[in-house]
């Protein structure tokens, strides 16, 4: 959750920076016969935005790879399952239903038992 908030904040800052640079570059008067200042800023901003977006996406993909998937041994509490305690099954179902898989109670109960 904290990673998503950081990524959202970074994306907002990047968009705000790009908008500010675009507004500032278009507000200056440009001499005839020279490269317009706005085109230079656009190419630099575009490059920076692309690099930043690639970095953010790679971090997000890396974080998703390290999260447990449905059916991963970390979902069920093995010590509770071996002793037959109901708490282990309840925890497994709870973890399954609150995961990103979006499974319902019956699917999670089938998987955990």
Curated annotation (Swiss-Prot):
What more does the entry say? Is 88% identical to As14a (AC P0C6S2).
A single GO cellular-component term from the record reads: extracellular region
Q: Which GO terms describe its molecular function?
A: toxin activity
Entry's localization field: Secreted
Major localization listed first in the record, in broad terms: secreted
Residues making up the propeptide = 22-86
Q: Does the keyword tRNA-binding apply?
A: no
Q: What is known of its domains?
A: The cysteine framework is XIV (C-C-C-C).
Cysteine-cysteine disulfides: none
**UniProt superkingdom:** Eukaryota
Signal sequence segment: 1-21
Species assigned in the record: Terebra anilis
Q: Which UniProt keywords apply?
A: Cleavage on pair of basic residues, Disulfide bond, Secreted, Signal, Toxin
Task: Give the UniProt family note.
Answer: Belongs to the teretoxin N (TN) superfamily.
Q: Where, by tissue, is this protein expressed?
A: Expressed by the venom duct.
Q: What is this protein's record name?
A: Teretoxin Tan14.1
């Amino acid at each position: 959750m904290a990673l998503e908030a950081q990524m959202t904040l970074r994306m907002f800052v990047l968009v705000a920076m790009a908008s500010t640079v675009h507004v500032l570059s278009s507000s200056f008067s440009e001499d005839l016969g020279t490269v317009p200042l706005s085109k230079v800023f656009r190419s630099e901003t575009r490059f920076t935005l692309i690099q930043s977006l690639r970095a953010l996406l790679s971090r997000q993909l890396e974080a998703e790879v390290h999260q447990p998937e449905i059916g991963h041994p970390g979902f069920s509490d093995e010590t509770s399952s071996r002793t037959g305690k109901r708490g282990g099954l309840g925890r497994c179902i709870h973890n399954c239903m609150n995961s990103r898989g979006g499974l319902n109670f019956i699917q999670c109960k089938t998987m955990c038992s």
